Every structure is written in structure tokens, then in C-alpha cells.
Amino acid sequence: MSEAEARPTNFIRQIIDEDLASGKHTTVHTRFPPEPNGYLHIGHAKSICLNFGIAQDYQGQCNLRFDDTNPVKEDIEYVDSIKNDVEWLGFHWSGDIRYSSDYFDQLHAYAVELINKGLAYVDELTPEQIREYRGTLTAPGKNSPFRDRSVEENLALFEKMRTGGFEEGKACLRAKIDMASPFIVMRDPVLYRIKFAEHHQTGTKWCIYPMYDFTHCISDALEGITHSLCTLEFQDNRRLYDWVLDNITIPVHPRQYEFSRLNLEYTVMSKRKLNLLVTDKHVEGWDDPRMPTISGLRRRGYTAASIREFCKRIGVTKQDNTIEMASLESCIREDLNENAPRAMAVIDPVKLVIENYPQGESEMVTMPNHPNKPEMGSREVPFSGEIWIDRADFREEANKQYKRLVMGKEVRLRNAYVIKAERVEKDAEGNITTIFCTYDADTLSKDPADGRKVKGVIHWVSAAHALPIEIRLYDRLFSVPNPGAAEDFLSVINPESLVIKQGYGEPSLKAAVAGKAFQFEREGYFCLDSRYATADKLVFNRTVGLRDTWAKAGE
């Protein structure tokens, strides 16, 4: 497949192709402009893949610009986290990192230009009065009594704002557009407000800060952005984007294009709701593996490649829709099935004793690291007469559909011997504590010599060599597809979104590193936890199961 055939197509790429063909642009320059007031989530990953992916495919540039115009909510911690997430996803920004605060001097100058043109004024209505005067979708707004101040008075008052002469909330700079506009965003929007807060880049130089809609378009123009890509909620804001650029002296006028945001089943993306999950301790932090944050997905074991593939599959449209969680899970499942080495771990262990195996002895069994990739090599796994198997892999009685170990019948131990269940021991409550078996010594990784068929295969871990491991069985955070539609979204949290088990793993897992996934054979995909795992305590997170159990449950 050629590069052109492999490249995804969508309405934005069609616009870019037309712009390049017509000569409107000779190159492509995009940007990813997050506000550093929180952690990125899977929805941001879509925007990252779109903006950086377009720049890559068209041999253009993509800037990373922090929209840092509200010092009260922003922090350098979020700046560092966002940079890390972008790089982890496999992208690199063009040149230095940009900050909207880099342009505060120019933005101030453009605000003064609008005042001089009679297109901006200092308003002393309170924030509550501004909201009241703005009107509604069905009723026009009304002019502020301060709207018709002279240019000279507005210049003096704006300078008073800049030098700290007003208290917060006592004055702001507004654009003079049309209070009767059918678009509320055009009803004299606020351009500057007062905030006496130290900024993580500019310190205490400024006490007035520009609003997003004023900053965004000018920053795009100053950076030479050719295609400014936003989600659909900014569609009406495009009118203000164009109005600002049309009314200041700036040589470049980028165009804004909107695409649908990512909505994903069984989770929430609202920053307010995610923050509530964290602050009320329904999860263990922003990087909790149940969270839709990039840091949470990474800790759970998602790969950057799987997230990029997911963003590619869902595409870019103008239609709002909700993506099935199964689609995201399918991407990581396919990635790890192809690339994750195999290992054996027993999550719900019960002891199995092979009574005719030489007592006190052990041997090494060779196992492939991947059944379909010999180039991934093999490993030596110890085998002995006492092993752990999963409790679900044994029944005293079962029908023919049960292909595991049954009393009086045989099963194969993965890459080892055929065994037969002979008897069990139970505790006072009737729970099986030990399964006693015999083995066929002539069946190591081969069929029985007499031709009898043994269909079932189960995994195991040698008891004498087993590593105690904690296994965190993560699942979907919510029990319904659209938790945001619930009257109280916290009431539909899945009570089994985290189940912690104490099990055993094969010795090779001692070399596991955070972020490197394994397929625990017959169980699912797991990775070492980056927070709780230590040299003395191995903790593994379930990334995803071998199959979609939610689809079966919903049938």
C-alpha cells in the first residue's frame, strides 16, 4: 500500500488538499493549544493525532502552544504532564514550545488598537450585570451604560486596569459589536479581565489577562497557522475569531475549522466530573487506570500505538456521535495480541499435587514467548510436583462442554504433562484446598503414546518457584454506557471496576518493567503497575481481557 493510499481521508484533509492545489497555501501549519489546567484525556488524544498527524503527512509543522491566559487555574505541573503525553503518543512539536503568554505585549497592543478604532470599551458593570444584559437565545441583549465612552476615556481606563487601579470584577474590556446579534458570543464579548494572580510564565508583570477568544485567533495569526482546528462547541466562536482578525492590523488571517469531539461509552470526559471523581476519592488520582486520561490509560497498559490506531479508526467528522468502548478495547487487544510476550499467572490459585512426580525434584520446561513469533524467542519455566492452578479450572463434576480438569479425567498442563485428577481435600466449609493428581511421564509436550485424546489445556505455576503477585482486575468505571445522562453520574459507578486478587506468577515476571505488557495466558493482558509495584511486591494491572465480556453480558 502506498503512502497516499494508507493516508486517512476526511473533510479537513479535503480542505487542505484544495488549499494546496489552489495555491492558497504552500505549506500546512497546525497547532495543538491545550490550557494547562488539568490532565489530557482520550478526547485530547484525538486532537493531538489530528493536528500532529496532518502536519506529518503534509510535511508541515505543528506547534504545541499552551493557552495560559488564566493564572488562577493553571500550573507548571500540567504543562509538564501535557508535554510528556504528547511525546509519549509519538509526536514532536515544531520549534520551541509556545505559550499564549509569549504574546501578552502584542495582545495588549491589539486591544489598544481596537479601542482607538472605537471597537472596544471599558465596562464597569458587574459580572452578574453583564450576564443579565447579555440577553438569551430568544431575547436580545441591551447596551451597557458604559458602552459609549470616548476613545480617550477608554484608553485611560484600560491603562488603569493594567496598572492595578481597579479591583477584580470591577472593570473589564469588551468588544463593541452588536448586543442584538442572534449569536450570543457576538454580544460585546469580554476581551480582558482583571486577575491579581501570579502567572507561571510572566510572574506578576500583568494583572489583566486576555480571554480565550481574543487570544486564540491572534496567537494563530502570529504563528502563521494555516488551519486552526477546533471541536464543534467552538463553531459559533468562529464569528468572533474572524471579527477580531478582520479589525486589527495583522497580515495573516487563519481559518478555523470545527470537527466533532470524542464521546466514549462507559466514561465521562467533563473536566468537572473527572475532578469530582478524584477529589471525592472514587478513583485514586488522575492516573487511576480506570480514568480516561492519557496518564491513566498509560498506567493501565495501553500503548501509544493502540491509541493512535483508535483515533485513526474513529475518523474525523462534523457529526456528534458516541464511540463504543469496545472499539478502544479492540485496538489495545489487537496490539498486545500481536506484540505482548506470553507468561503464566494464576489469579485465583488452588494447590495441585502430582503424587507420582519425583518428590522434591523439578525440571525446566521450554515455552515460546509468542506462539506465532519465533523471533521473540523462548524461556525456561520451572515445573515441579506441586503447582498452582486456577480454581475455575477444576470441577468435581462437569458436562462435556467443560474442557478443563474434572475428577477422574485428564487435562494437559500448558507445555508440560498430561495429568489426571484423583481426589481432593476440603476445609471445614467444603472449599477445595488441594487437588491430588497423577501424571503421564511420557507426555512432556507431546500426545500420549497410546493415542488417547486429551482436549483441555490449562495453565499453571510451580509452587516452589512461584512469585507472589497482586493482580488488579480493572474494568469499566461505569456500569451504564452513558453515565453523563444519569441524574447522578456517581450513582452508576461500577462497583466491580476494581477487584484486587492475590495470585502467583512464573519466575520470569520478576524482570517485568512498568509499561511493558504481557499476555497472562488464558487470562488477559496485564502490565506492571507504575505506582504500587516494588522490587519486593509485584503488582500487575489488567489492561484488557482476552475477549469483550461486556458484549456477551449485553446479549
Swiss-Prot record:
Listed SUPFAM superfamilies: Nucleotidylyl transferase (SSF52374), Ribosomal protein L25-like (SSF50715)
Q: Where is this motif: 'HIGH' region?
A: 34-44
Residue span of region Interaction with tRNA: 317-324
Q: Tell me where the sequence motif 'KMSKS' region sits in this chain.
A: 268-272
Example of a GO biological process term: glutamyl-tRNA aminoacylation
Q: What is its EC number?
A: 6.1.1.18
Q: Which residues bind L-glutamine?
A: D67, Y212
Show the GO cellular component annotation of the record.
Answer: cytosol
CDD domains recorded for this chain? GlnRS_core
Q: Which InterPro entries does the UniProt entry name for this protein?
A: aa-tRNA-synth_I_CS, Gln-tRNA-synth, Gln/Glu-tRNA_Ligase, Gln_tRNA_ligase_bac, Glu/Gln-tRNA-synth, Glu/Gln-tRNA-synth_Ib_cat-dom, Glu/Gln-tRNA-synth_Ib_codon-bd, Glu_tRNA_lig_a-bdl
Origin, by domain of life? Bacteria
Cellular localisation: Cytoplasm
Q: Which reactions are catalysed by this chain?
A: tRNA(Gln) + L-glutamine + ATP = L-glutaminyl-tRNA(Gln) + AMP + diphosphate
Which keywords does the record carry?
Aminoacyl-tRNA synthetase, ATP-binding, Cytoplasm, Ligase, Nucleotide-binding, Protein biosynthesis
- Binding-site list for ATP: 35-37, 41-47, 231, 261-262, 269-271
For molecular function, the Gene Ontology terms on record are: ATP binding; glutamine-tRNA ligase activity
Record-linked PANTHER family: GLUTAMATE--TRNA LIGASE, GLUTAMINE-TRNA LIGASE
Record family assignment: Belongs to the class-I aminoacyl-tRNA synthetase family.
Self-association and partners: Monomer.
Q: What is this protein called?
A: Glutamine--tRNA ligase
* UniProt gene name: glnS
